[in-house]
Amino acid sequence: MIVEKKYVAAASGVLLSALVANYSLSDEAPAAWEAPTRAAAKKNPVAADTDSVAAGKKVYASNCLACHGEKGKGDGPASAAVNPKPHDLAEEAVKKQSDGALFWKLTEGRKPMPAYDKTLSESERWQVINYVRTLGK
């Protein structure tokens, strides 16, 4: 009976490892990442002034640059190890999204990007969005 439990535990571990490896090595494009309508409608309460953008740039450098890169192109030093690849934050598709949609994504995260609701204050997240809006200009 004890031997049987060991085999079940070992088989479960192998199966779990295979599932994780399959997910992380998959070349399939991730499904569209859409913010809920209510979240997308949320307005940015932080003015996109010089101070806010500068503060957002500092937060971005500490939390986002490793994957998204200096110019937001998704080519940061850690991007090679990330699957799926980080989005290009300077592309038109990102620019078309509302501040509320970007805030929701930054807050909630989606693998491999972590959620920043516990790491960054609301103000810092809005500042990052103000900074991201300057990328590609």
What are these regions (language model features)?
Residues 2-11:
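Bacterial N-terminal signal peptides that target proteins for export
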Residues 24-27:
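Boundary of Sec targeting at the N-terminus
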Residues 29-59:
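Electrostatic cytochrome c docking/interface patches
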Residues 11-19:
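Bacterial N-terminal signal peptides
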